[in-house]
Regions:
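N-terminal signal peptide c-region/cleavage motif recognized by signal peptidases
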Residues: 15, 20-23
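Absolute protein N-terminus
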Residues: 1, 24-26
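Asp/Glu-centered strand-loop micro-motifs enriched in Gly/Pro and often flanked by an aromatic residue
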Residues: 1-2, 65
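Bacterial N-terminal signal peptides that target proteins for export
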Residues: 2-11
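Glycine-rich, small/hydroxylated-residue low-complexity segments
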Residues: 26-395
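Generic hydrophobic/packing signal
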Residues: 12-16, 219
Length: 395
């Protein structure tokens, strides 16, 4: 998408420039109106007691977010800097800064600082076609986030960043995100059984990162999430990846319209049924291309086997041997002979030496989602073959 910048006329008369200055002043109310015109398609609107304009800075006073259904959520003062009106009547905002959060509920206090969105494009007409009709942002950032209960910090996040980059040829987007230094204190668990499990598994203090990376190609509607990883110290790394096609701009518009109609219907039961039917229709456009789930162990497997074994009066090794013996018996009931041996071999390899376990699906050609749903309901044992499922360990 091309982010048009406001054209600045090169005029030679200083007096004329002075007179023209007011003509090019930003219209704060028009900006808010167009933000809401685009945002209502995504779930709500923003209200403000006042809109102040100072050069290219627009301040939304005492702002609140009102979902299409539900109570308004107070936000406070939102500062929009580097605001420019595009030639087509849309807007570009260099940065939107939100007030810090400090709220207490049920004895727990949540604080969050440094909340910003960057490179925001507000469409002139959200009902139009193409990227110019979408509300987009280039980056989202938060500083430290903390949850404190009874004087102790039970959760914290060092910070987060999400980036959305339009390709030069406007064929699609690349995106990535990182939620760094996520920490959770589980020592305050009140349930005795939960506390015992936490202690045995050495999960009293969890520390790790969540990262993601992917791309969206607009014409075929291909969303390729190559990384959605949960990486925790002394636990392991779980990575989810998937690729689907058919998620095109018209699909997005249809999805938004279906959601809007459901929100507008006062009969919620009827609205849910109508939305469900709409979703079934839209699902016809989506196809599954590939998926992978991979776990790289960082010592949690041995502790889990030891704990599970202790609950059954056996050692961790005995529990592992028991699982290896049970796996082929359980798989035999599923009637998937082409996968049974591979799964059993992978489980045996992993339990003997826990390093990694991978489940992947890569059909020879994209499979329409309705076909997958039909197979799941009518002949679930055919799914591994339809999707090209493979299981491996320590590779």
């Amino acid at each position: 998408m091309t982010f048009y910048r406001t054209t600045r006329l090169m005029l030679s008369g200083v007096a004329f420039l002075s007179l023209a200055g007011s003509a090019f002043a930003l219209d704060g109310q028009d900006l808010l109106k167009k933000i809401n015109a685009a945002y209502t398609l995504q779930g709500g609107t923003i209200a403000a007691d006042g809109v102040d304009v100072d050069g290219t800075t627009v301040t939304l006073k005492n702002a609140s977010f009102k979902p299409n259904s539900g109570a308004a959520l107070p936000i406070g003062e939102i500062t929009l800097t580097g605001v420019e009106e595009d030639e087509d009547g849309g807007y570009y905002i260099e940065e939107a800064a939100f007030p810090d959060i400090n709220t207490t509920n049920d004895g727990a206090t949540l604080t969050a600082t440094g909340l910003t969105l960057g490179g925001i494009s507000i469409p002139a007409d959200p009902k139009g076609e193409g990227l110019d009709s979408m509300l987009l942002y280039e980056s989202a950032h938060s500083g430290p986030v903390k949850v404190v209960k009874d004087g102790a910090e039970v959760f914290s996040l060092g910070g987060s960043d999400v980036n959305l980059t339009l390709r030069e040829d406007e064929s699609g987007f690349d995106f990535d995100g990182a939620f760094k230094s996520l920490k959770a204190d589980l020592t305050k668990a009140s349930d005795p059984q939960s506390k015992e499990a936490i202690d045995k598994l050495a999960l009293q203090h969890i520390n790790g990162d969540i990262t993601m990376k992917g791309a969206w190609e607009l014409t075929p509607g291909t969303i390729d999430v190559s990384e959605f990883a949960f990486d925790f110290t002394n636990v392991g790394k779980l990575n989810l990846a998937f690729k689907i096609s058919g998620y095109t701009m018209p699909f997005v518009k249809s999805l938004q319209e279906a959601a809007k109609q459901a929100e507008a219907n006062q009969n919620k039961e009827e609205a849910q049924q109508a939305f469900g039917l709409s979703m079934l229709g839209l699902m016809q456009q989506l196809s599954f291309e590939s998926a992978q789930i991979r776990f790289d162990d960082a010592s949690i497997t041995k502790r889990a086997l030891d704990y599970a074994g202790s609950q059954q009066g056996m050692s961790g090794k005995q529990m592992a041997d028991s699982l290896k013996a049970m796996t082929p018996i359980m798989l035999a009931q599923l009637n998937i002979p082409e996968l049974q041996n591979a799964v059993s071999a992978a489980v045996n390899t992993f339990l003997d030496d826990p390093k990694s376990l991978t489940v992947s699906a890569a059909p020879a050609k994209p499979v329409p989602l309705p076909m997958i749903m039909g197979a799941a309901m009518g002949a679930p044992n055919t799914l591994p073959q339809v999707l090209g499922v493979k299981v491996s360990a320590n590779d």
